[in-house]
C-alpha cells in the first residue's frame, strides 16, 4: 500500500486526502445514526489518511486540507440544495395543478346546479285540418266495397 501511495503524484494524493476525509465524515455520520455495520472501516480510513498525509509532509507539500475538505463538502451541499429546490418547484407545480383542477370542478358543479333558463318556443301556426265528409254506408255501398276487395282467383 505504501509503495502504491508513494508512486502517486502530489495532486493525486491531495485528491485522495479530500476523498478520505469525506468518507470519514460520512462514516461518522452513519455510525451516529446506527446505519454503519462495519465500524472497522473508520479505523482503516484514518490509517490510510495518516499514511497519505505522512507522504505529503515528507515531500514538503503544504496542503490546507481543511479548506479542501470544506470546499468538497460545500459542493456536495450545493448539489443537494439544487436537488431539493427542484423537488420544491415540482411540488409547487403539482399543488397549483390540483388547485386549478378543484376550481374547474367547482365551477362545473355551479353551472350544473344553476337553474337553466327556459327556452322560448316559437308557436307554429297550424292549418286547421280538413274535415272529411263521411258518407253514410248503405247496404249497396257495402256490397260494392266488398266486391272491389275480393280477389279473383
From Swiss-Prot:
Residues 100-153 are annotated as: Disordered. InterPro entries: Ribosomal_protein_uL29, Ribosomal_uL29, Ribosomal_uL29_CS, Ribosomal_uL29_sf. GO terms for cellular component: cytosolic large ribosomal subunit. Residues 140-153 have a biased composition (Basic residues). One of its GO terms (molecular function) is structural constituent of ribosome. It comes from the Bacteria. Residues 1-83 are annotated as: Large ribosomal subunit protein uL29. One of its GO terms (biological process) is translation. Keywords: Ribonucleoprotein, Ribosomal protein. Residues 84-153 are annotated as: Unknown. Residues 100-121 have a biased composition (Basic and acidic residues). HAMAP family: Ribosomal_uL29. Belongs to the universal ribosomal protein uL29 family. NCBIfam families: L29. This is Large ribosomal subunit protein uL29. It comes from Mycoplasmoides gallisepticum (strain R(low / passage 15 / clone 2)) (Mycoplasma gallisepticum).
Amino acid at each position: 500500500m505504501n509503495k502504491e501511495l508513494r508512486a502517486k503524484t502530489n495532486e493525486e494524493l491531495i485528491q485522495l486526502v479530500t476523498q478520505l476525509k469525506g468518507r470519514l465524515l460520512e462514516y461518522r455520520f452513519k455510525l451516529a445514526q446506527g446505519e454503519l455495520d462495519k465500524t472497522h472501516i473508520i479505523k482503516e480510513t484514518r490509517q490510510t489518511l495518516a499514511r497519505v498525509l505522512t507522504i505529503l509532509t515528507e515531500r514538503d507539500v503544504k496542503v490546507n486540507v481543511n479548506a479542501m475538505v470544506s470546499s468538497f463538502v460545500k459542493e456536495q451541499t450545493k448539489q443537494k440544495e439544487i436537488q431539493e429546490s427542484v423537488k420544491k418547484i415540482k411540488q409547487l407545480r403539482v399543488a397549483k395543478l390540483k388547485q386549478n383542477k378543484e376550481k374547474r370542478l367547482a365551477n362545473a358543479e355551479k353551472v350544473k346546479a344553476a337553474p337553466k333558463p327556459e327556452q322560448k318556443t316559437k308557436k307554429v301556426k297550424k292549418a286547421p285540418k280538413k274535415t272529411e265528409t263521411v258518407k253514410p254506408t248503405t247496404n249497396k255501398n257495402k256490397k260494392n266495397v266488398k266486391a272491389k276487395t275480393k280477389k279473383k282467383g
